[in-house]
Amino acid sequence: LGLGSFMATSAKAETTQEASFAAASALTDALQLALTLEYLEDEYYRLGINTSGLIPAADKVVFQQISKHETAHVVFLKAAISSLGETPIAKPNFDFTAGGNFQPFTDYQQFMTLAQAFEDTGVRAYKGQAGNVASNKAVLQAALQIHSVEARHASKVRRMRMNKGWVESNNGGNMPAATNAVYAGEENVTQAGYNTSTLFGAAAGSASFDEILTGQQASMIAGLFIS
């Protein structure tokens, strides 16, 4: 009985330790992904506001403020990763033309198109990683705070482009096909087993609930702009 009890206790301790390591790894991976996305947005807006003649004066103040937010997010995430005893990933080399498909720093409309795509990606990506940062309450709180700010960015940029401030179905609005991956899955109308389109219709049902992006999906989208 004593040996059996010891073995059971040891197995439980080992399982608990393995779960703890898994949670720590998931937390770090989530933060590194978030840092990659924030690096992307931070550099994008910095380049945009420093490109002479690109952004109209009336809009520039908006992007200057968004840029400040993204820089603050980068600083926080690097500090959070370091506090966990890990090394923050280095900032990648970005190609915001995505291999020549976009010219955001010579065409303001394209600049805003990618701004919307990046912000909508960020909103879904943070939501997708919530479970992976739940093991650390301080990080979870900060991640949720960043998530809500990213949602405000997305809504503002969408309205600047004459779109609704929210996403309906998998239609990003007046967006090119090259951004389809950002909105894939947003057409879902079933939440916790309930079909929200039953009472409200598919457009309202899908718009009422944002969908997540998995880490793999978010990394794939970001990877399109990493050289």
Please give the residue ranges for each predicted region.
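All-alpha RGS (Regulator of G-protein Signaling) helical domain and cognate RGS-like helical scaffolds
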Residues: G2-S227
